[in-house]
Amino acid sequence: MAHVATEYVCFIDSDIVVEHGTLTRLRREFLDPAVAVAGPRILGLPLSPAAGSVAHYEAARSSLDLGSGPGRVAPATRVSYLPSAVLMARVAALGGGFDETMHVAEDVDLVWRVVAGGWSVRYVPQCSVRHDHRVEAMAWLERKAFYGTGADQLARRHGDLVAPLRLDPLCATAVGALVAQRRWSVPVAVIAAGAHLGLMAARAPSPQQRLATGANLTAMTLVATGWQFAGAATRHHWPLAAIAALVSRRARRGIVVAALAEGIADYRRVRPDLDPATYLLLHRADDLAYGLGVWAGALRGRSIRALLPVWTRPWRRGQASPTKTPQKEKTHGTQVV
């Protein structure tokens, strides 16, 4: 990039096949002077008849494929990063460009720095490229773990933006009580959920709609919190879940339910060309490898910041809104690439 003399630059990895019209379509985004970076959808190469299960899984669930929905890119949103496999950018907005000390997650870091600088970053799935995915089992698992190691570096540079969980304290208490499966679980959950409903209802703009608004927001936040708990137990925090499962029958039961429920829901959303059992096994292996990478990065960096949740404060927010999980559109929390 230091040698680029043009107004725009496009980074393209050597294992990418650019489809016709993609670069022209990306260039169109920069007619908006606020746009600094734009990226296309990254799909796999067409599958051969001999393609194995991992190839079919990656075709449906690659970490590089951010889905069919266009959108603004920013931390803790539906599209929280863009892979640097293909990026078009306005040179003046990039500053020093990629941090060359980072060998993983450098693309996430660049996008987040650009967004923090006040620029707009866009995901443009209307155009696409093809990527030569890793489809050998060990190479695939190693790459997933490698992605996970970047969480520690991002946490050092961007703090809570990389947090794997964003939790409302009251709803987290309610869901946590139910997960504990004790005699006091239901009363505690009811009290915590009722307190959240009261807070949301008190801030509804219309007195006539307070109860309905509060109930709707509380229900949405409880569901989102439950999915975050399931994702944490099977992805970022699975080592802790595994330890709990060794000593507690309730924990084992809860982890099995979480692993099955999250996997089945993901299968229904992705609709892969795989049978449910094979997809579920590969999905769990994907999460285990990524989580192992996150913990390896944390141990290497001697910091658990990338594993800590962020606690929201609903009583201090300007508007009542449900707690949302940033991935698993692709992943729970931020999927580091």
Regions found by a protein language model. Give the residues of each.
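Conserved donor NDP-sugar-binding/catalytic core segment of glycosyltransferases
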Residues: 21-54, 132
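Active-site-adjacent helix/loop segment of glycosyltransferases
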Residues: 124-125, 130-188, 199-296, 302, ...
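Short, flexible, basic/aromatic active-site loop/helix in glycosyltransferases
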Residues: 40, 56-79
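A short, conserved alpha-helix in the catalytic core of glycosyltransferases
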Residues: 83-87, 93-97, 101-127
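The conserved acidic donor/metal-binding loop of glycosyltransferases
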Residues: 13-17
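Glycine-rich, basic loop-to-helix element that forms the pyrophosphate-binding segment
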Residues: 1-4, 70-74, 113
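Actinobacteria-biased recognition of intrinsically disordered, low-complexity terminal regions
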Residues: 307-337
